[in-house]
């Protein structure tokens, strides 16, 4: 939400955010005991956590995706659960079910793995649509219904779903409407050579660094509310809107060449998440105000899964990343 009060004391706000965001460095240091490299992935996890959003990670197996969210849950003193999505999984295996007790002749409720602060949905595209939608509904509503009872999910609540971009056989691709519910879609890349050398040494070492809880869930909930206090100037809001509108009407921004390549642009959910992700990025960098670089830093992960490409774009091997890059390089920066 924009701050229209012209007399806003940015200095005070900046000091407050600097003080309240100090825990971010502690969290990063703790996670880095287990994770070498993958700075972007860890930053995006923190953005998802602070922005009350969820993250879709795409990458081949073995890139520390599971380890990252597990390490984060340990450092935050939160509960963690992992759901391995398979073709025979049922919605009840995710959200929970009613169990009949023959002795007492009554039903009792068994809560599913979705009742945790940090939920890893591993290979989400391996389960049928009804299972995917059960999880995505829980993500959206922050509550689930088992039988005739509705249960609120634990706060904070972060879902990190993974999918393998290589193996597409026997998978159920997420529909556009479902993918849009993820705040960010992050493509995880291989580590650099020197990072991988450190990974080998760390895994062959007999000394194991255990992750200690350095932040409480209460601190995270306070930080989630503080993110809204990060100041965003009207010029930055206009910049965000220009970027989003450029995905819908590229010809109005002198990008006529993109019109035949884009089948649909980002929805208002894209605008909301871009503004929120920029605020979160400013917060984790200990700043009480948003600058254009914050928007440019997160835009690819916010819009990657929100822009539809035409067959023509696919034939020309044009990716959404290419489209976003062109838009960012063209739209005027305030």
Predicted features and spans:
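C-terminal engagement/docking regions of AAA+ P-loop ATPases
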Residues: 2-13, 252-334
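AAA+/SF3 P-loop NTPase mechanochemical coupling elements
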Residues: 108-117, 146-163, 174-183
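P-loop (Walker A) phosphate-binding loop of NTP-binding proteins
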Residues: 60, 94, 162
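Pre-Walker A (pre-P-loop) alpha-helix and adjacent loop at the N terminus of AAA/AAA+ ATPase modules
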Residues: 17-63, 245
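Walker A/P-loop
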Residues: 49-86
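Conserved AAA+/SF3 P-loop NTPase catalytic/coupling segment centered on the Walker-B
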Residues: 113-140, 154, 169-178, 190-198
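Conserved alpha-helical scaffold flanking the Walker A/P-loop in AAA+ ATPase domains
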Residues: 44-47, 100-120
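Conserved C-terminal "switch" segment of AAA+ ATPases
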Residues: 13-21, 34-35, 171, 185-257, ...
């Amino acid at each position: 939400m924009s701050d229209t009060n012209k007399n806003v004391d940015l200095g005070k706000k900046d000091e407050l955010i600097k003080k309240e965001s100090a825990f971010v460095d502690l969290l990063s240091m703790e996670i880095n005991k287990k994770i070498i490299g993958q700075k972007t992935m860890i930053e995006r996890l923190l953005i998802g956590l602070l922005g009350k959003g969820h993250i879709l990670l795409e990458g081949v197996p073995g890139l520390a995706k599971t380890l990252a969210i597990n390490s984060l849950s340990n450092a935050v003193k939160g509960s963690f659960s992992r759901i391995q999505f398979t073709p025979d999984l049922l919605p009840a295996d995710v959200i929970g079910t009613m169990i009949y007790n023959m002795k007492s002749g009554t039903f009792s409720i068994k809560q599913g793995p979705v009742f945790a602060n940090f939920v890893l949905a591993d290979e989400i595209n391996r389960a049928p649509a009804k299972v995917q939608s059960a999880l995505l509904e829980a993500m959206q509503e922050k509550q689930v219904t088992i039988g005739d009872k509705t249960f609120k999910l634990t706060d904070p609540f972060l879902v990190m779903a993974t999918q393998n971009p290589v193996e597409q056989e026997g998978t159920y691709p997420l529909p556009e409407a479902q993918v849009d519910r993820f705040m960010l879609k992050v493509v995880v890349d291989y580590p650099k050579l020197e990072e991988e050398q450190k990974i080998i040494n760390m895994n062959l070492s007999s000394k194991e660094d255990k992750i200690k809880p350095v932040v409480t869930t209460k601190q995270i909930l306070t930080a989630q509310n503080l993110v809204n206090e990060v100041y965003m100037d009207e010029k930055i809001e206009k910049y965000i809107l220009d970027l989003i509108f450029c995905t819908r009407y590229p010809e109005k921004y002198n990008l006529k060449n993109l019109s035949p390549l884009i089948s649909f642009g980002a929805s208002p959910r894209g605008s909301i998440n871009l503004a929120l992700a920029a605020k979160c990025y400013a917060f984790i960098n200990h700043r009480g105000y948003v600058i254009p670089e914050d928007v440019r830093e997160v835009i690819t992960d916010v819009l990657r899964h929100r822009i539809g490409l035409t067959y023509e774009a696919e034939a020309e091997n044009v990716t959404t990343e290419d489209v976003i890059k062109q838009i960012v390089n063209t739209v005027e920066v305030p």
